[in-house]
């Protein structure tokens, strides 16, 4: 049973990959470089996190041009990392990349590390979005694709607690890309609030 897990080197996706592996999935991590400012820092942490958890090294989808086509605070340092964080189509890009990869390795399941939708900030972080995406992705790749987001049952605090219990190791969650997290971006704030 194979699953493509979208992996960023962050807490949520690392825990997701570990849980999938523990459930018996053969995990194929996929790191998407969409031109985000944090790409290199995220990738190095992603490689280390997968290794720490006994999971194969991630395959990299190099789609850097997306960040130039769709600039946001995550892809352009001239834009505000919080106020202009929404990157239209980002999760759709991730899911289409994962579904296409899944089709080439005979996997029917893809996983994304979205959390409890009560706290979603963007329109592509809801169950409704995922249900509609699943239909589109199955049509797009010519096979049934199951989109799973098991962490949607949990808050950030619960994900942090589960990660500690699983001892998943060091992860990286910062949109700026500096080695020391900025403490200002949405990812940092979410982590800090969840850790309180």
Where on the chain are the PLM-derived regions?
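ATP-dependent adenylation/nucleotidyltransferase module used to activate substrates
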Residues: 1-166
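A polyampholytic, Gly/Pro-enriched intrinsically disordered region
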Residues: 79-82, 166-172, 192-196
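Local cysteine-cluster metal-coordination motifs and their immediate loop/turn environment
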Residues: 96, 170-193
């Amino acid at each position: 049973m194979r699953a493509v897990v979208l992996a960023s080197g962050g807490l949520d996706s690392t825990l997701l990959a570990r849980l999938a592996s523990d459930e018996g999935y053969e995990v194929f991590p996929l790191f998407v470089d969409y031109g985000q400012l944090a790409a290199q820092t995220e990738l190095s942490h992603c490689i280390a996190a997968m290794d720490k958890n006994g999971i194969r090294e991630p395959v990299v989808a190099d789609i850097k041009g997306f960040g130039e086509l769709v600039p946001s605070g995550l892809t352009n340092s001239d834009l505000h990392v919080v106020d202009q964080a929404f990157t239209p189509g980002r999760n759709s890009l991730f899911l289409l990349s994962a579904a296409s990869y899944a089709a080439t390795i005979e996997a029917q399941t893809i996983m994304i590390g979205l959390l409890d939708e009560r706290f979603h900030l963007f329109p592509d972080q809801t169950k409704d979005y995922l249900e509609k995406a699943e239909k589109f992705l199955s049509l797009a790749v010519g096979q049934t694709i199951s989109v799973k987001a098991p962490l949607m049952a949990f808050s950030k605090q619960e994900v942090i607690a589960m990660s500690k219990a699983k001892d998943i190791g060091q992860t990286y969650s910062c949109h700026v890309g500096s080695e020391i997290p900025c403490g200002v971006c949405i990812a940092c704030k979410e982590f800090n609030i969840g850790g309180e």
